[in-house]
Amino acid sequence: MKFDNDSEKQVFDKLKKAIPGIIKEKCAGYDELYGYKLNPEGLTQEEVDKYYDEKIADRLTYKLCKAYQFEYSTIVQNLIDILNWRREFNPLSCAYKEVHNTELQNVGILTFDANGDANKKAVTWNLYGQLVKKKELFQNVDKFVRYRIGLMEKGLSLLDFTSSDNNYMTQVHDYKGVSVWRMDSDIKNCSKTVIGIFQKYYPELLYAKYFVNVPTVFGWVYDLIKKFVDETTRKKFVVLTDGSKLGQYLKDCPYEGYGGKDKKNNLTKQNVTNVHPTEYGLYILQKQIIEDVE
């Protein structure tokens, strides 16, 4: 964690001290962020050892501070909003309990390269060119959004928040095959909803986003997205009309279609499917199952 001045460190310390009260008084006791526990109060030592990692909690707290420019009141309000949204929306369930349409699962890919460049190790791929061929998948916005949030949560589980080179994720949106002239209204609605959720409830997690196989006249893709994100996020965007040039940015991505160094595996073979929740995330999910039964 890097603080540019004493004031930033003071804001961080103030927030860390206030988190237990914020969780108790403003979030109905809900204490989980991306599968991790922020507050050790009320736990036995055994539970602390199993479910609470102070280093991770500190770095998540720092991310919140950084996301909102160390403005204390803004940080607190957004933390409240994020935790309450997670309590109500249940993104862990999206990732690990719910069964999504198989066709959706085939166009959302996770890859992980331990030897990749800093913060380009965990990559979420969205193959929109394949998705738009099945417009019926976008007709139920809620189902699509829950699938997409589940993919995001699985991607986050591949990060190491204590590591300086793997505490952000990278995304690739592949638009090969998408019409350059029009976009179905259902697809637009789903995209708009997902973008809004990511911008509001997943701050300071994106390292870079690559839009690939985007025709020159395909300006609405970028125009749609940039309307709903801040300037800091927009600076992380890279638009490539030629998908085979992606390898210049993600060196170990598949050679097939993307020009990376991996000539043995295509994207399907690189896909990481065996993803598990954190210990604390698993505890929350098991608790929910018990409550549902009762």
UniProtKB/Swiss-Prot annotation:
Cofactor (UniProt): heme b
Entry keyword Ligase: no
Other remarks in the entry: Present with 6540 molecules/cell in log phase SD medium.
Any matching Pfam family: CRAL_TRIO
Cellular compartments annotated: Cytoplasm; Endoplasmic reticulum membrane; Microsome membrane
Domain CRAL-TRIO residues, every copy: 100-266
Family named by the database record: Belongs to the SFH5 family.
GO cellular component, one term: fungal-type vacuole membrane
Major site of localization recorded for this protein: cytoplasm
Protein known as: Phosphatidylinositol transfer protein SFH5
SUPFAM superfamilies attached to this UniProt entry: CRAL/TRIO domain
Keyword flag Transport: yes
